[in-house]
């Protein structure tokens, strides 16, 4: 299965910059699956600019409710209508800045699945939690609280909703720091074991992305690690050439 390279633009990007970015991606054939998650207002313009290129689009959050009197919230159904196929949920910046709990992330994931979106559920520990030896415990608790039953096929018998996990150590996001390869491999193995326990057969194959200061210079070594099914890329996804370089590193794996 090709690795997934997902770009999280966060609150960056402009309408004026869409054309050049899309032009760089359109002819590319890196061998990895590409997903770009721009700010919600840019999803439809970027979709149009990509002009059918094999690049999926995603959102960075969605609301628990599908519609109604919820000022400022993002409807999962509307995101799908705009062209999104995926949605990032539970990113550490959302958990910290908006006090989102794992229970809220779980409800958002249910809503996303109902709207036909694939949830990318983020987990990760702080520097203090890693230093105190609690990293795996914290991440397992986030998984236990954030993953809906739909991902195990427990809601509609025989129907397993697709989902993706993204492990992002909080202290590595945007800092230029990355954990050691041994630490990444150990955490991904721990996540895989937790997914098997929690989701059964579905958990054995669910992709686990690594995120946190992924860049062209370290992508190949990170993407070659066991149980790393791709990358959730932040700052490096804002430049098409860097994003494609990371995708090319995945293809060489």
From Swiss-Prot:
GO molecular function: triose-phosphate isomerase activity
Any one GO BP annotation for this protein: gluconeogenesis
Superkingdom, natural source: Bacteria
Active-site residues, Swiss-Prot/TrEMBL: 91, 168
Sites where the protein binds substrate: 8-10, 174, 213, 234-235
One cellular-component annotation, GO: cytosol
Catalytic activity: D-glyceraldehyde 3-phosphate = dihydroxyacetone phosphate
rRNA-binding as UniProt keyword: no
UniProt pathway annotation: Carbohydrate biosynthesis; gluconeogenesis; Carbohydrate degradation; glycolysis; D-glyceraldehyde 3-phosphate from glycerone phosphate: step 1/1
PANTHER family the record matches: TRIOSEPHOSPHATE ISOMERASE
Purpose of the protein: Involved in the gluconeogenesis. Catalyzes stereospecifically the conversion of dihydroxyacetone phosphate (DHAP) to D-glyceraldehyde-3-phosphate (G3P).
Similarity section: Belongs to the triosephosphate isomerase family.
Protein name: Triosephosphate isomerase
Species this protein is from: Acidiphilium cryptum (strain JF-5)
Lineage of source species: Bacteria, Pseudomonadati, Pseudomonadota, Alphaproteobacteria, Acetobacterales
């Amino acid at each position: 299965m090709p690795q997934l390279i997902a770009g999280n633009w966060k609150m960056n990007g402009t309408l004026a910059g869409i054309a050049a970015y899309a032009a760089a991606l359109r002819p590319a054939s890196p061998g990895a699956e590409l997903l770009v998650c721009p700010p919600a207002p840019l999803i439809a313009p970027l979709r149009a600019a990509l002009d059918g290129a094999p690049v999926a689009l995603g959102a960075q959050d969605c609301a628990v409710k599908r519609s109604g009197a919820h000022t400022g919230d993002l409807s999962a159904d509307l995101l799908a209508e705009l062209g999104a196929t995926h949605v990032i949920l539970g990113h550490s910046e959302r958990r910290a800045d908006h006090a989102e709990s794992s229970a809220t992330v779980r409800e958002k994931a249910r809503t996303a699945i109902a709207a036909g979106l694939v949830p990318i559920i983020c987990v990760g520990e702080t520097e203090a939690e890693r230093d105190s030896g609690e990293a795996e415990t914290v991440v397992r608790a986030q998984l236990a609280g954030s993953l809906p039953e739909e991902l195990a096929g427990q809601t509609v018998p025989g129907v397993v909703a697709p989902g993706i996990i993204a492990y992002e150590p909080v202290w590595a996001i945007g800092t230029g720091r990355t954990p050691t390869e041994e630490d990444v491999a150990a955490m991904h193995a721990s996540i895989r074991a937790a997914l098997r326990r929690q989701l059964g057969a579905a958990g054995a194959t669910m992709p686990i992305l690594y995120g946190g200061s992924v860049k062209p210079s370290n992508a190949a070594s990170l993407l070659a690690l066991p149980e790393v099914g791709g990358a959730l890329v932040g700052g490096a996804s804002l430049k098409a050439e860097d994003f494609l370089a990371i995708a090319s590193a995945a293809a060489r794996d």
